[in-house]
């Protein structure tokens, strides 16, 4: 803050802008997750600062934003055909969120949509494995009877072994799930189909989610 002042850089707080400019447009936490609400408020506040819209236009923005669907964020799909292997994912949830709030929101989403017990495919960047994620990852892993740890082709990606060690030290394996390790996202998808009727959750990294969507040929323009 002090540095911004010295450099004459404008510093604007989203909470102040949104509460003032969108006082009549509030989102219910029972419908939208905390990370989504924060993104929503930041986007609308930035637009208002830039364009200084009137009340009618702000209401139009607000209405339009509520219809936005982000592929790969709490993205629940049904009957996803893996055409290469002629196999079908009855229920597939993909989410690239990798911070504390996003992982907690993912656990809440799994619970509210009755997706537990599930098979969890988890891959994360090594620089994300810090103490603030221990409890969120523990809550997430509790939903899974089978946890498949994998990695992507990126220097930032944690190895399956490093991820397993972090989860063990976080108490995430206390419920004794089955654990499988692989460096191949494609192999992880194959492993996840060992119980065809069990919901599959792929999470922890946008790289991982991108690979899953690419391998399965998922169209990012729509969800089913």
Language-model-detected regions and their locations in the chain:
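C-terminal helical cap/extension that packs against the catalytic core
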Residues: 1-12, 16, 37, 87-92, ...
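Short alpha-helical
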Residues: 69, 100-101, 127-128, 155-158, ...
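Cofactor-binding loop segments of dinucleotide-utilizing enzymes, especially the Rossmann-like FAD-
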Residues: 122-126, 151-152, 204
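A glycine-rich beta-strand to alpha-helix segment
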Residues: 188-217
């Amino acid at each position: 803050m002090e540095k911004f002042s010295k450099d004459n850089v404008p510093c604007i707080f989203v909470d102040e802008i949104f509460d003032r400019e969108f006082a009549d447009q509030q989102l219910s936490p029972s419908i939208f997750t905390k990370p989504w609400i924060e993104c929503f408020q930041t986007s609308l506040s930035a637009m208002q600062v830039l364009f200084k819209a009137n009340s009618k236009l702000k209401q139009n923005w607000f209405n339009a934003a509520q219809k936005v669907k982000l592929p790969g964020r709490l993205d629940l799909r049904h009957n996803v055909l893996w055409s290469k292997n002629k196999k079908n994912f009855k229920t597939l949830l993909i989410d690239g969120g990798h911070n504390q709030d996003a992982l907690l929101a993912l656990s809440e989403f799994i619970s509210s949509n009755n997706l537990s017990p599930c098979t969890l495919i988890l891959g994360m960047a090594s620089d994300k494995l810090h103490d603030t994620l221990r409890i969120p990852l523990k809550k997430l892993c509790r939903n899974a009877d089978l946890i498949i740890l994998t990695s992507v082709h990126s220097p930032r990606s944690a190895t399956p072994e490093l991820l397993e060690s972090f989860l063990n030290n976080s108490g995430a394996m206390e419920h004794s799930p089955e654990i499988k390790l692989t460096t191949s996202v494609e192999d992880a998808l194959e492993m996840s189909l060992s119980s065809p009727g069990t919901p599959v959750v792929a999470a922890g990294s946008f790289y991982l989610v991108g690979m899953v969507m690419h391998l399965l040929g998922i169209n990012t323009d729509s969800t089913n």
